[in-house]
């Protein structure tokens, strides 16, 4: 399944969470890469329900005396021009985003690497529909 979304600015919270060693380790183990410390937010033209796909759910954990919630992780390919970049949609247990906004992680800062700006449209490829 290919989904198109418009690049939008986020709150900057992804940067904090992705800078924490436990999250870095979790994502590296699941995805095979250490994600850039930040997410790329995409606004879709419809609601996104990760529960329709074969995602991986991480456990809650404690770090430096604080409790952190797990996330649902869905590996994807990010399609920009003729490039296919490994990435993932991440859906935290606690989120402030509407269901039309998805957060994407990748091994690099996608905005810089591909000169993306708010309003640009990119595509993502999702495999692993629960019905497959």
UniProtKB/Swiss-Prot annotation:
Positions bound to Mg(2+): 39, 41
InterPro entries in the record: Archaeal_Riboflavin_Kinase (IPR053397), RibK_CTP-dep (IPR039063), Riboflavin_kinase_archaeal (IPR023470), Riboflavin_kinase_CTP-dep (IPR023602), Riboflavin_kinase_dom_sf (IPR023465)
Pathway: Cofactor biosynthesis; FMN biosynthesis; FMN from riboflavin (CTP route): step 1/1
EC number per UniProt: 2.7.1.161
GO molecular function: magnesium ion binding; nucleotide binding; riboflavin kinase activity
Reaction catalysis annotation: riboflavin + CTP = CDP + FMN + H(+)
Keywords: Flavoprotein, FMN, Kinase, Magnesium, Metal-binding, Nucleotide-binding, Transferase
Coiled coil: none
GO BP of this protein: FMN biosynthetic process; riboflavin biosynthetic process
Pfam families in the record: CTP-dep_RFKase (PF01982)
Cofactor names: Mg(2+)
Cofactor annotation comment: Binds 1 magnesium ion per subunit. This ion is coordinated by a threonine and an asparagine, and by the alpha- and beta-phosphates of CDP.
Annotated FMN binding sites: 95-96, 103
Residues annotated for CDP binding in this entry: 10-15, 108-111
Domain of life: Archaea
Family the UniProt entry places it in: Belongs to the archaeal riboflavin kinase family.
Record text on subunit structure and interactions: Monomer.
Function: Catalyzes the CTP-dependent phosphorylation of riboflavin (vitamin B2) to form flavin mononucleotide (FMN). Can also utilize UTP as the phosphate donor, although less efficiently, and it is unclear if ATP and GTP can also serve as substrates or not.
Protein name: Riboflavin kinase
